[in-house]
Amino acid sequence: MPIGESYVGSAHPIAVQSMTNTSTLQTEASVEQICRIAAAGGDIVRLTAQGRAEAENLRNIVAAVRERGLHTAIVADVHFVAEIASISAQYVDKVRINPGNYRLSGGAFEALIAQCRERGVSLRVGVNHGSLAKRIFDEWGDTPEGMVASAMEFLRICQRERFDDVVVSMKSSNTRVMVHAYRLLVEAMEREAMTYPLHLGVTEAGNGIEGRVKSAVGIGALLADGIGDTIRVSLTEAPENEIPVARKIVDYFASREGEFHVEHPERYSPTAFVRRSCVQTPIIHSELSDDFVVMESTSANPTAELRARLLDTPAEQAVVVKRRYDDSELEDVALKAACDLGVLFLDGLADGIWIDAPALSDEQIKDLELMILQASRVRFSHTEYIACPSCGRTLYDIEQTLAQIKARTSHLRNLKIGIMGCIVNGPGEMADADYGYVGAAAGRITLYKGREVVERNIPQEEALEHLIALIKANGDWIEK
């Protein structure tokens, strides 16, 4: 399907994309950032359109980008208001709407489809785990099944209207939820003869190596299954930093070859987490004992090879999966290992991890193994930060704030802390966090304990101290 002058789906290469974090009212700043993303190799760039003024200014941004000779596809990100989607569709190549806050009643979605068809604009039905509609939540809860139900309502309308230029996404900050949601969606679409392209991404992955590992675990699990037509690696960093990471992941899967026979396919459940063995807490290689056997892959398709061998291994045998990486850079080893091995833990198949990387120190390998286990949701060993990458809706410097919060709280190993730019997806995406720090207005922060608001409209310069005081008041603080 076309997105401007780009194509996604079928045999077309996997497209990589990012999202600006400038205000969409700031034309020059937004254009400059789009140019940097394009220069880094981005195929698609998304901008937030939270109001009429932002939607109307997309005209100026797109015109300025085209004047510079760039043909990068431009996407409007719309929440809540159908009118804003309609305005945006006049100027951009694609409109993303969120089924969780877009009304189906009244024919607004059909009207948007008609407008997009007339202009040659594509749509993205972008489901977020953290912002399911109340009626969906009441019936399904915040589950992968609920995410699929939300998407299918809109896809059925697209199918009925014979509108095919649609991309679908099922994003979550929880890698297991995200992977199961996409797999369930593929099954649901196949049952109803739908073949819409899929956009992959893990929301609120964070920054640094941890953010890259978390994205690679989720995205890699699906690419290993042959699922995915576009991807975004969401990082709480400059948007252009996302593109080289996404390219590395895409390129890593482009050269995979090899099929492996499975004697016991009935042992595999792709849409439910079932432990293969009785080992409850997977180990890292320095914890290896005689109770485990080591299963090493040397093939060009390590995920498929190890998954096949694990499925044919008796449940009473605990297995540590091993892979050697000769790369010299930590990021390259981290991305490859997360892509190769993370899914084996997401699916409950492996019992331990061994990364053989001669260029890395023992401490780096240990940290990386623990990061992959944590990103795969099977062993938590350090503070987890659910941090959004920010966009034009963010009203504070989230990258700097994340660094400050990490500096003060990274020793609190059993906690999950959400750092969110705004309330659109923030409270929902960090629903399983112990504490939350969410932008409420310019220079103002709201603090959460679990899902409950405990303090509103705190001046940003005071918010970190208030967060620490809240953690202490609930008995979760440990002195360094």
Residue ranges and their predicted role:
Residues A11-A29, T48, A73-F80, G100, ...:
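Active-site mouth loops of central-metabolism enzymes
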Residues R52-A76, L112-V121, L185-M194, S255, ...:
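Alpha-helix-loop-beta-strand connector modules within alpha/beta enzyme cores
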Residues V95-N98, V121-G130, L198:
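Non-cysteine beta-strand/loop elements that form the S-adenosyl-L-methionine
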